[in-house]
Amino acid sequence: MRVENNNVSGQNHDPEQIDLIDLLVQLWRGKMTIIISVIVAIALAIGYLAVAKEKWTSTAIITQPDVGQIAGYNNAMNVIYGQAAPKVSDLQETLIGRFSSAFSALAETLDNQEEREKLTIEPSVKNQQLPLTVSYVGQTAEGAQMKLAQYIQQVDDKVNQELEKDLKDNIALGRKNLQDSLRTQEVVAQEQKDLRIRQIQEALQYANQAQVTKPQIQQTGEDITQDTLFLLGSEALESMIKHEATRPLVFSPNYYQTRQNLLDIESLKVDDLDIHAYRYVMKPMLPIRRDSPKKAITLILAVLLGGMVGAGIVLGRNALRNYNAK
């Protein structure tokens, strides 16, 4: 009984089980179909690689400009604002900030145009504002490198133009303020001179009325007041009036400092300033590997997909034959 049971169990096959050897035999017999499927898939992959647009990414790293790059701009700001001028470090941060904003705006514009272009700017190190990594995706390696350099220069020129315009506006405003200050000080000095002459003329009237022709006191600034000025005598007072009338206006040191500031501002030549809002840490690189399409990966996937499709055709065809035979 035990032997018979063993024989029966050994001959009992489950029809639902997959016979791997049988599958391999079927695939081997249908190898030409699989090979043809793989060849077709490879041909399609090669066709795709031939017509697909290549993508190459050129990258550059920038940071805030050096002190030497903004020396002229810093000097102009010192002339315009004097002691209130911003520090060099503040100017550096402001310039790279304006460059980053203008670059981001350009990237947004390129992304929204009909034929999109991918231009990006982002921090090189996470949680650090500087340096910045800028990149451009082009259809050729040389084109991506050239375009990135072109857009960086374009943004720098734009920022430069904006800074020159701001400087010209600030120079015009500073010149007007200084000219107004000079006019005010000149008016005050003229009024002081006129007041002095009127005071002497009034003292001369008193001296004539008192018939004082000769000095009755020593002429010292500490002793003489408006009330005792007539004691200098009419002769001295008449001479003083003539002297005061031809005497140039007397100004404070602040007046001459204001004039010097005005001359300095008027001598500024904004058009000659060469302002750069950034400095290269790494210039636009020439990419050596394209982003897409990847030839090796595409061909490998084509072989795998072609093989899978071919195997599916072989197994499906055999399954259909077996079904029809039943």
Curated annotation (Swiss-Prot):
State which residue ranges cross the membrane: 32-52, 296-316
Q: Which GO terms describe its biological process?
A: lipopolysaccharide biosynthetic process
Q: Where in the cell is it found?
A: Cell inner membrane
Q: Name one Pfam family in it.
A: Wzz
Q: InterPro entries from the xrefs?
A: Bact_polysacc_biosynth/exp (IPR050445), LPS_length_determ_N_term (IPR003856)
Q: Which Gene3D superfamilies match?
A: FepE-like (3.30.1890.10)
On assembly, the entry states: Homodimer.
- Record-given protein name: Chain length determinant protein
Quote the gene name from the UniProt entry.
wzzB
